[in-house]
């Protein structure tokens, strides 16, 4: 079975640049056609699908969202749900706690096999290493709501400064260190959780 991995390009609260920026700094070619992205997933089991290349309307939303400095429901929720890889397992981070149950209900309606909608109660739109995270887990058409915290996974809490990203080159260097086993601190723990 092929692992289908799609990382959307949204700068999170913990970083000033998105995943596409860091991947480009690592030398990854992100400006692929849908056919090239599909071929990568089929051949090696992983691929980065840059949303604007697959859904051109996202280019129209991405610019104003960046200029206004706001997150919209379109890019942060609808964008990941129209995943061109048609992945039925998903980890979806949302930027407001009230979006957790709403997004989970949408995932049920879209017949996702297994998904988690998460919101760090400290404001992160991902599973938080800083404190508690609200989770709505979708499995077999049912939604189970609960909270998790780093200690549930034998991980230590940290501060936002400990996991803050930076410019694309800083983030690329952090990724290299993580995958080389040179970083066993909060960045690693954050990666493990998400």
Please place each PLM-identified region on the residue numbering.
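Active-site cofactor/substrate anionic-group-binding motifs, chiefly glycine-
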Residues: 1-9, 13
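Short beta->alpha connector loops at strand-helix junctions that form conserved
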Residues: 8-9, 32-34
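Active-site-proximal loop->helix
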Residues: 12-29
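Glycine-rich anion-binding loops and their surrounding alpha/beta cores
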Residues: 2, 24-31, 39-194
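Short Gly/charged-rich anion-binding patches and loops
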Residues: 18, 36, 102
